[in-house]
Structure formats: C-alpha cells, structure tokens
Amino acid sequence: MFDAARLVFIDETSTNTAMVRLRGRCPRGIRLIDHVPHGHWKTITFIAGLRRRAMVAPFVLDGPMNAISFMAYLQRCLVPTLKRGDIVMMDSLPVHKVAGVREVIEAAGARLRYLPKYSPDLNPIEQAFSKLKAHLRKAAERTIPRLSRRIGVLTTKFSPDECASYFRHAGYAST
C-alpha cells in the first residue's frame, strides 16, 4: 500500500500562440463572431508535477522536449521539490527513459515508477492540463512571453481540493 500524498505525477503538454476557444455562446438568431489567428504560431512545451495538494515544479520550454531538456528539468525543477519516500510517476515517453533519469530521482530519496503504456486515465495531471488549456484558450495569448507568464499564473490556481479530486478521478485514494 502507498500514501497518495507521496505520489508525484509528471507529464508534459504543448501549447501555442494560436489557442482559442473552440465553442461559444450568443443570443439565439445572432451569429457568433470571434477573431481566430491564422498563419504562423509558436509552440512551447509545458512540464510540471502534480501532487495530491498542488501543482509543483512548473517549467516552460521554448521547443520540444528532448533528453537534455528533460534531465535539466529533473535536476533544476523537480528534484528540489522531492522528499525522501516520494514516488515519481510518469508515462513511458522515450525521453523519460534515457540514462540517468532513475539515478537523479533516486539520489533525492524518491522512487521512480512508469505508468502502463497508453493509459492517460491513470495520470491525474492530464485533468489539470485540460483545465489549464481551457484557461489558455480563454486568455488567447499571442506571444511566447505572455503565454509563459499566463501559464505561471495559472499553475498557482489549482487548489488542494481540486488536485485531490484529480487523484480520486484517476483512481488514487486520497488518504
């Protein structure tokens, strides 16, 4: 048995400067009109950890995740938040399995576990990312600096009760 408070789920997601709301409302009989960006946009990668009480170690990367950037994230952002006995859970993305990942996490006194392949429903941070992206669509930021700042603000908006509900939804008892 494990204590859900010791679990730290990490994952990454991409966002871009062309994110807009996908649906809208207006009075019946009136056409809904909104501005939608077209042309070139920039994509960034956001990676973070989710504990039962908070989102931790948020990091924005201008570009795709690779082995070097993932190791840098672990060493600079995630490991300082880990406590002895924590269990770091992540999916089986190839960059999560490069040499040194397990050693960095275990040196902090934590354990590493991989989720089964094709099982986003077992990772509660997926629910948090869904909410984050909905807020990003609403904000419709068009530059990388503004998008990064908005992500930083939004990561502080996840309440302890909300994080616990993501854990329950994914099947992890909130003890």
Where are the language model's segments positioned?
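Short functional hotspots at interaction and active-site rims
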Residues: 1-175
